[in-house]
Amino acid sequence: MSMSQSRAVQRSSSPNEDRGENQLVVYDLKGNDDTEEEVLPVQSQPLSSRTQCPSIGAFTVQCASCFKWRLMPSMQKYEEIREQLLENPFFCDTAREWKPDISCDVPADIYQDGTRLWAIDKPNISRPPAGWQRLLRIRGEGGTRFADVYYVAPSGKKLRSTVEVQKYLNDNSEYIGEGVKLSQFSFQIPKPLQDDYVRKRPARLLDSIDNTNTPVAKEANPLAWISPDDHISLQLGTPTESGLNNSHYQPSKKKKTSTLSIFGSNDELADR
């Protein structure tokens, strides 16, 4: 969820967001709250410089009924929930699969307390084909882009755009024979809620710098897997921190939806 990183849907304050329904992605900036429940231990450190890149740390999903955040037991479960989040909103009862005593009456697993960087992402991202990985690399604060997405084929080949994926599939038709489709790939990235995390660029430079102009499959959306040489641990958070307008980030009560969340740390974590 942090490839949460996650699953669930929530209203966005931006009119440009698709249908106003998005996921939340969280990246650890300062450290863990010892009172929070842990799935896997995350050891965090303060950012030593603006160029230090946060790592993805954990996955969470927001209940569509009580709006509390629930930790996901694994990135795989997070991706499973995220893939059909619009059609099947997440509820606390769903978490009984891995936590039998959970309900909306149980306090949230985690709260947003200023120790993590949140970013908005979209639900219903297709899971990568079997044997493939979808990777999200977060860039350091102050850069011109928040993150990069790329895929790793079973052969180990890294693909950084839809064009590269299409060419690779054309050159390796056995994957097409196995049912791999271009619609299973997405290179959209999350959007940080911290306004100054990404350095503003002149409008005339956007088209030449931003590499998201390549065609994106309609069925695919954003977020990420962790690279074999990336580092990961798991944990979670909720959008009620001062400075955030709760009306912007509270799912509409007319239609029950959920929100997904992931967060990370600046530490080097064990390889997956």
UniProtKB/Swiss-Prot annotation:
Keywords linked to the UniProt accession: DNA-binding, Metal-binding, Nucleus, Transcription, Transcription regulation, Zinc, Zinc-finger
CDD domains noted in UniProt: MeCP2_MBD (cd01396)
InterPro entries from the UniProt entry: DNA-bd_dom_sf, Methyl_CpG_DNA-bd, Znf_CW
An example Gene Ontology biological process: chromatin remodeling
PANTHER family, per the entry: METHYL-CPG BINDING DOMAIN PROTEIN-LIKE, ISOFORM C (PTHR12396:SF0), METHYL-CPG BINDING PROTEIN, MBD (PTHR12396)
Subunit text: Interacts (via MBD domain) with DDM1.
Alphabetized Pfam families for the sequence: MBD, zf-CW
Keyword Heme carried by entry: no
Function: Probable transcriptional regulator.
Disulfide bonds: none
Name the record gives this protein: Methyl-CpG-binding domain-containing protein 2
Start-end of Polar residues biased regions: 1-15, 236-250
Residue ranges of the motif MBD-associated domain (MAD): 62-104
Keyword Metal-binding tagged: yes
Residue ranges covered by zinc fingers (CW-type): 53-112
Subcellular location(s) per record: Nucleus
Occurrences of domain MBD (ranges): 118-192
Binding site for Zn(2+): 63, 66, 92, 104
Residue span of region Disordered: 1-24, 236-272
Gene (UniProt): MBD2
